[in-house]
A protein has these predicted regions:
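Bacterial N-terminal signal peptides that target proteins for export
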Residues: 2-12
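Helix-centric, low-specificity signal for extended rod-like, repetitive segments
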Residues: 1-2, 150
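Subset of outer-membrane beta-barrel
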Residues: 25-326
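Bacterial N-terminal signal peptides
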Residues: 12-22
């Protein structure tokens, strides 16, 4: 009974976050898998990574960041979302182009009518296929003549969703850009890797529900602006102002180019979510973990693995493991 109560709270949370569509016969609204903060390193910083570059997780946050990613990179992640639901992500990127797939499954939830009596067992499933690209001076040579480091990106999203016996699908398009600035020296220290980003989300697109698309709901255009900078060549600060007024603050400290420690806060209205994370970089193989707290639900634990084949060095990785393992 306690588990069913928790799952009903999860569905209530899904219904409250974003009005993605009105489900026929249910009269509720559900969120999209795209509204859950993706990735693992990004989640550890509460999603304040929209201006970071050269990372396969740029696929999820700002495709323009893919422009500086060379070679082949693979990423995968899994989380027990809110302690009950399953959230899984996969991504692959090659020389600025990327494909991704996100899956959310609430599990079985006991449905109830207006009087509170049990009706049927329902489940909410939502998947999204992503195709993204990032173009910078490596791909567009004329950008090298600009006084700033400019890159542009785009993303095509295909979404499928089902709630009980009702299903739907749709697509949307995003465009984004990033600008990097020269280092700034202030007294005895310098600020490096200063970047700003802007993602224009869901420029057009809609979800269609029912056998004959009786119900249609547009995604609704929104913006996500971001800023990040590095201090002392090891400490990264990130700030994102996201859709529906969300504020993301994050920090990452890297020790010996091996261990990354992350923390962040996400604010929406008067609701605050806190995150922490840790990452281990083993010469091309990254292992990441993130924890996200929730006010009335169990914490989300997410783990992921990223492989950068261009940096993969099994010999160096073996040496690192020998130093850190007993």
């Amino acid at each position: 009974m306690k588990g069913n109560s928790k799952k009903r709270r999860i569905v209530a949370l899904l219904c409250a976050v974003v009005a993605a569509t009105a489900i026929a016969g249910v009269g509720q609204s559900v969120t999209s898998v795209l509204e859950i903060e993706p990735g693992v390193a990004g989640l550890g910083m509460a999603g304040a990574v929209g201006s970071r570059t050269g990372d396969v997780e740029s696929l999820y946050y700002n495709p323009a960041g893919l422009a500086s990613l060379e070679g082949l990179s693979l990423t995968s992640s899994y989380s027990s979302q809110w302690g009950e639901s399953n959230y899984t992500g996969f991504g692959v990127a090659f020389n600025g182009w990327a494909l991704g797939y996100l899956m959310f499954n609430s599990g079985d939830v006991e449905g109830r009518d207006d009087t509170g009596s049990p009706t049927e067992t329902l489940s909410y499933k939502n998947n999204a296929a992503l195709f993204a690209f990032g173009l910078g001076e490596n791909q567009l040579g004329f950008l090298a003549s600009l006084p700033v480091d400019l890159s542009i990106g785009g993303r095509l999203k295909f979404v499928t969703t089902s709630f009980g016996e009702t299903s739907g699908s749709g697509m949307a398009v995003d465009l984004s850009t990033q600008i990097g600035f020269n280092p700034v020296r202030l007294g005895g220290f310098s600020i490096t890797d200063m970047r700003v980003g802007l993602a224009m989300l869901d420029l057009f697109g809609r979800l269609n529900y029912g056998e004959n698309d009786e119900y249609t709901e547009p995604f609704g255009m929104d913006l996500r602006a971001s800023f990040s900078a590095m201090l002392f060549d090891a400490l990264v600060f990130g700030f994102d102002f996201g859709p529906v007024g969300t504020i993301h603050l994050g920090v990452e400290y890297t020790l010996l180019d091996l261990l990354a420690i992350r923390a962040g806060m996400l604010s929406l209205a008067d609701v605050f979510t806190f995150t922490i994370g840790i990452g281990l970089d083993l010469q091309g193989i990254g292992i990441d973990y993130a924890l996200e707290t929730h006010n009335n639900l169990s914490a989300t634990h997410r783990i992921g693995v990223t492989i950068d084949l261009g940096r993969l060095n099994l010999g160096s990785m073996s040496g690192i493991l020998q130093r850190i393992l007993p």
